[in-house]
């Protein structure tokens, strides 16, 4: 199966992505993660105003196959969460890089994502799995 790897995103080896626009980060999970999870049935996300710390858990995603922790690629404060996904978590599967985003975060340091995986590095990791 062929997956999409947007070039303007950075990736964690745990399959979360981050896209930075100024000081705002959009966070979600990759198309590969969606494929591996299968049918998504539950999503737990932090509240607006909650603090995230890079590398630490910020929520949970549950599918018919597994329950996975979600890891933050950035440190900052949640300014928006995708409420539509709380009620209909299966929508993540339809458009993980677009309408299936999880959180928008005001980041403390936009440069901290520089050591996250590039699209090419992430692709190499996924194709090696």
UniProtKB/Swiss-Prot annotation:
Name of the molecule in the record: Glycine cleavage system H protein
Gene: gcvH
An individual GO BP term: glycine decarboxylation via glycine cleavage system
HAMAP family, per database record: GcvH
This protein's UniProt keywords: Lipoyl
Annotated signal sequence range: none
PTM annotation (N6-lipoyllysine): residues: 65
Residue ranges constituting the Lipoyl-binding domain according to the UniProt record: 24-106
Cofactor(s) this protein cannot do without: (R)-lipoate
Function, in words: The glycine cleavage system catalyzes the degradation of glycine. The H protein shuttles the methylamine group of glycine from the P protein to the T protein.
Coiled coil: none
Cofactor annotation remark: Binds 1 lipoyl cofactor covalently.
Protein family: Belongs to the GcvH family.
